[in-house]
Regions:
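Residues in well-ordered beta-strands of folded domains
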Residues: 50-52, 84, 118
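Short acidic-glycine-tyrosine-enriched beta hairpin
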Residues: 93-110
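Ligand-binding loop in jelly-roll beta-barrel domains
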Residues: 111-126
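Short, conserved beta-strand element in jelly-roll/cupin
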Residues: 74-90
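Conserved short histidine dyad/triad with adjacent acidic residue
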Residues: 32-35, 50-75
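A short, N-terminal "cap"/entry segment at the start of jelly-roll beta-barrel domains
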Residues: 2-53
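Short, glycine-/Ser/Thr-/acidic-enriched flexible segments
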Residues: 56-57, 88, 113
């Protein structure tokens, strides 16, 4: 399993209004959200928001904290909202497994140490 992480800083509104298309894309577009057997996270200084994607194919993917969170586990001080945009899968939270289909959502509250993503079928990964 591999977790990729990037950090985006907030832009000054007076500067941002002068950005051309290329610069706007550089500052705001998250291009690599889904990749097989990877969790990709982008932390934005706008509201300290994390946008991420997980695509379990050959292995389960465990949501681990990244250094900037300064936490022992990912949901130590934050909540997670999940929307499945792929095939059927499961999310295991603290040992309880939730089935999640296409366009279904799951809320994970603060304080849950274990979050694991799995696909039901690797030919149609969640």
């Amino acid at each position: 399993m591999k977790t990729n992480f990037s950090l985006r800083y907030a832009s000054n509104p007076r500067d941002a209004k002068n950005y051309d298309t290329a610069r706007l894309r550089e500052e705001f577009l998250v291009e690599r959200l889904m990749a097989p057997d990877e969790i990709n996270l982008t932390y934005s200084m706008y509201d300290r928001l994390i946008v991420g994607g997980a695509m379990p194919v050959d292995e389960a993917l465990r949501l681990e904290p990244v250094d900037i969170l300064r936490a022992d586990y990912f949901t130590e001080r934050r909540e997670v909202g999940i929307i499945n945009v792929g095939g059927a899968g499961t999310v295991t939270v603290e040992g309880e497994t939730y089935a999640i289909g296409f366009k279904e959502a799951l809320y994970i509250g603060r304080g849950n140490r274990e979050v694991v993503f799995r696909s039901d079928d690797k030919a149609a990964p969640a």
